[in-house]
UniProtKB/Swiss-Prot annotation:
Record bears the keyword Cytoplasm: yes
Protein name (database record): DNA polymerase IV 1
SUBUNIT field: Monomer.
Cited InterPro entries: DNA/RNA_pol_sf, DNA_pol_Y-fam_lit_finger_sf, DNA_pol_Y-fam_little_finger, DNA_polymerase-Y, DNApol_IV, PolY_HhH_motif, Rev_trsase/Diguanyl_cyclase, UmuC
Keyword Secreted assigned: no
Classification via HAMAP family: DNApol_IV
UmuC domain ranges (all copies): 6-188
Localization of this protein: Cytoplasm
Length: 468
């Protein structure tokens, strides 16, 4: 009999899996979700794409090169992922009263009914939980279980894809000891490098240190905590998390930035990191803030507030770039950060995001940006791959391809099965922009959310790009 069981539920390839769920033709295809521009980054990759070596946070051009012409590249649909995530964890909460949600796609739980249970009973419960999520949403989860959060999270990683891994308490130390030290929660690239320089490659080697040695290497605060985790001591409680007020990312440069070209190149990468966290959080942002620390250590911040919350990368990044001052006027820049705030649930992304920005400039509040402008208006006849559309007879669909005066639409949703493709003139009046949520085909569930006016849980979202 074991005393405590913590579960870690992790949705498998969540962003790409939601795309394959709502666009059935993509099932079994190598799907990449992320930025489509030259500096785009992969936010999510299906397991079919991962088989080629593609992964999250990889430059999109590199992932496409690895996969070749069979790659399906789609822009993120944050509003769809948010509702899918909400339904997943509503389902989990039907079996477990307290869920500590870390992001869109993962959470801890400590079911009270498993206190003192044997491993076989835990396996049965985990399978019941996975089956309930799959039946309710059509999405696949992996579940790990152990005596604490650390072991549970490692176990869910070992269970992927589409599996369960229950680690008995007597097995935990043996499992931990042989793993790379980077697998320990809280060990980032900087700490990993410090440990490697001292010949400490595994969690077992870290556990063999004394408390004093761990504190000396990793710091007086974090060192002892990581040392305890390495020894399998993890009594952290599972608790509901409060919503973060801001999502941010920043980087300190070894050499100061002195030109607008350097600033533009740097902010694209930093904003991409912050945007990935925004997508995982599940809410949209209204306010974009750019933070700059000059070579004299003084700090300058500039911000702009849009009329509505959004997860649209194009709108957010364009505003961030336009907030940048010229280093020739203010001096060299040693640190640059991007923050998204004014976070709230989005039930529907604006169908003409850039146009809304242009038309509602008077409603936007700008700080320290006299004369700032917003993105140019969107041309409604220029369809993008991944756009959700509707046809009066064929129903809901998505743009599969566009160019040379025509647009190809695949008409399908989660409940339809693989659909047929139709080609139209690009200026056709037969198709119109549609809500991405219609692709989920959950009218009753989404309608109930609208009635409740409730918000989903979210994860803490502070990110330091400089330590990645």
């Amino acid at each position: 009999m074991e005393s405590r069981w913590v579960l870690h539920l992790d949705m498998d390839a969540f962003f790409a899996s939601v795309e394959q769920l709502t666009r059935p033709t993509l099932r079994g295809r190598p799907v990449l979700v992320g930025g489509l521009g030259g500096r785009g980054v992969v936010a999510g990759a299906s397991y079919e794409a991962r088989a080629y070596g593609a992964r999250s946070a990889m430059p999109m051009h590199q992932a496409r090169r690895l996969i070749g012409v069979t790659a399906v590249v789609l822009p993120p649909r944050g509003v769809v992922y948010g509702i899918a995530s909400r339904r997943v964890f509503d389902t989990v909460r039907g079996l477990v009263p307290v869920v500590e949600q870390l992001s869109f796609d993962e959470a801890f739980a400590e079911p009270p009914q498993l206190a003192g249970a044997v491993a076989e009973d835990v396996e049965t419960f985990c399978e019941r939980l996975r089956r309930r999520v799959r039946d309710e949403t059509g999405l696949i989860a992996s579940v790990g279980a152990g005596s604490g959060k650390q072991i549970a999270k490692i176990a869910s990683g070992l269970a992927k894809p589409d599996g369960i891994r229950v680690v008995r308490h007597a097995e935990e130390q043996a499992l931990l000891s042989g793993l790379p030290v980077r697998r320990l929660w809280g060990i980032g690239p900087v700490a990993e490098e410090k440990l490697h320089r001292l010949g400490i490659e595994t969690i077992g080697q870290l556990a063999a240190l004394s408390d004093a040695e761990a504190a000396n290497i990793l710091g007086a605060t974090i060192g002892p905590a990581l040392h305890r985790l390495a020894r399998g001591i993890d009594d952290r409680p599972v608790v509901e998390r409060a919503e973060a007020k801001q999502i941010s990312a920043e980087s300190t440069f070894a050499v100061d930035l002195t030109t607008m070209e350097q600033l533009h190149e740097a902010i694209d990468s930093i904003a991409e990191h912050a945007h990935q966290r925004l997508l995982r959080d599940g809410r949209g942002a209204r306010t974009i803030t750019v933070k700059l620390k000059k070579s004299d250590m003084s700090t300058l911040t500039r911000s702009a507030t849009m009329p509505y919350p959004t997860t649209d990368a194009g709108a957010l990044f364009t505003v961030a770039r336009r907030l940048l001052p010229d280093p020739l006027q203010i001096g060299p820049i040693r640190l640059l950060g991007v923050g998204f705030s004014g976070l709230s649930d989005i039930r529907q992304e604006s169908l003409f995001a850039d146009s809304d920005l242009t038309q509602e400039t008077a409603a936007a509040h700008y700080v320290e940006t006299p004369g700032a402008v917003v993105p140019a208006a969107h041309d409604a006849t220029m369809w993008r791959v991944g756009d959700d559309v509707a046809h009066p007879e064929l129903g809901h669909g998505w743009v599969q391809g566009a160019g040379h005066g025509v647009v190809t639409v695949r008409f399908e949703t989660r409940g339809s099965g693989p659909g047929s493709a139709r080609t139209f003139p690009v200026d056709t009046g037969d198709i119109s922009n549609a809500s991405p949520l219609d692709s989920l085909d959950w009218p009753d569930y989404i309608g109930q959310l609208s009635v409740e006016g409730s918000a989903g849980a979210s994860a803490p979202t502070v990110d330091d790009v400089g330590d990645r």
